Amino acid sequence: SVVRGSPEIAFVGLYIVAAEFRGRGFGRQLWDEALGKFDGLTLGLDAVPEQEATYASDGFASAYGNARFSAEARELPDPEPDAGILPSSSVPFDQLVAFDAAHYFGPRPAFLRTWITGEGRQSLIATDGTSITGFVASRPTRTGNRIGPFFAANATIAGNLLLELATGLTGPVSID
């Protein structure tokens, strides 16, 4: 997939060719087509270690490692009461876009609107009473829920957002 998150940025990730079609160049064709559509943009890549040499041949370099963390929603502790956590719909959308843009690579209102309003999706904000101090969203998967985007001013706010979000979810909750 290639997702254009803003006018200047796109992310590439997760393309898999079925085993019976591997070795015929289909993966490379998909890769070249995806990169060609976004020539001139800054590209981010969700990469698998086994393909790092392939990605490097196209100019990508590893910036950091990534790990997935998962837990059953019901096994997480309760959130702190009165932590200033509200549904994201409780603030004007332009404020949410501005907060997200300050933590991403720029504004992405169309992506954000779709991301937080799709079926089964949930999103929360943290507020100090005057401004947004955190934002988290979840989406359903075949096996549970994925968390992201997820931005917070500090670890306490992040913890409260995650735990509050988990109270409305069932099954595994994953973040990576």
Name these PLM-found stretches:
Residues 4-13, 18-24, 29-43, 52-53, ...:
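Intrinsically disordered, low-complexity, positively biased terminal segments
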Residues 40-49, 61-75:
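Conserved catalytic-core motifs of GNAT/GCN5-like acyltransferases
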Residues 48, 57, 150:
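Surface loops and adjacent helix of pleckstrin homology
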Residues 54-60:
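Conserved active-site tyrosine of GNAT-family acetyltransferases
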Residues 61-63, 80, 142:
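A generic fold-level signal
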Residues 65, 81, 147:
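Glycine-rich, flexible loop/turn motifs
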Residues 72-90:
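Conserved N-terminal entry element of GNAT/NAT acetyltransferase domains
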